[in-house]
């Protein structure tokens, strides 16, 4: 393989790595945002004393157990 061919393969590998990294990062951002929203909702319910209210406790078993 010539030097030009090696350089071309190197550039293709860098480009492919960048594309894969970019798309997986965007997917990860969506999951992180959803997790953060759920965590803030759970924290808000806990702060308001949801687990002491029978109806709230019944509607949110994931927090109150």
Curated annotation (Swiss-Prot):
UniProt similarity note: Belongs to the conotoxin A superfamily.
Organism of derivation: Conus bullatus (Bubble cone)
Residue pairs linked by disulfide bridges in the UniProt entry: 50-56, 51-64
Expression across tissues: Expressed by the venom duct.
A GO molecular function held by the record: acetylcholine receptor inhibitor activity
Keyword Transit peptide carried by entry: no
Lineage: superkingdom: Eukaryota
Keywords for this protein: Amidation, Disulfide bond, Ion channel impairing toxin, Neurotoxin, Secreted, Signal, Toxin
Name the UniProt record assigns to this protein: Conotoxin Bu19
Signal peptide residues on this chain, from the entry's feature table: 1-21
Residues excised as propeptide: 22-48
Modified residues (Cysteine amide): 64
UniProt keyword Disulfide bond present: yes
Domain notes: The cysteine framework is I (CC-C-C). Alpha4/7 pattern.
A Pfam family per the record: Toxin_8
Cellular location(s): Secreted
GO cellular component terms listed in the entry, alphabetical order: extracellular region
């Amino acid at each position: 393989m010539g030097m030009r061919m090696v350089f071309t393969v190197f550039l293709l590998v860098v480009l492919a790595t960048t594309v894969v990294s970019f798309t997986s990062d965007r997917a990860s951002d969506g999951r992180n945002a959803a997790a953060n929203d759920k965590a803030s909702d759970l924290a808000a319910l806990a702060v308001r004393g949801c687990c002491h209210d029978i109806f709230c406790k019944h509607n949110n078993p994931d927090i109150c157990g």
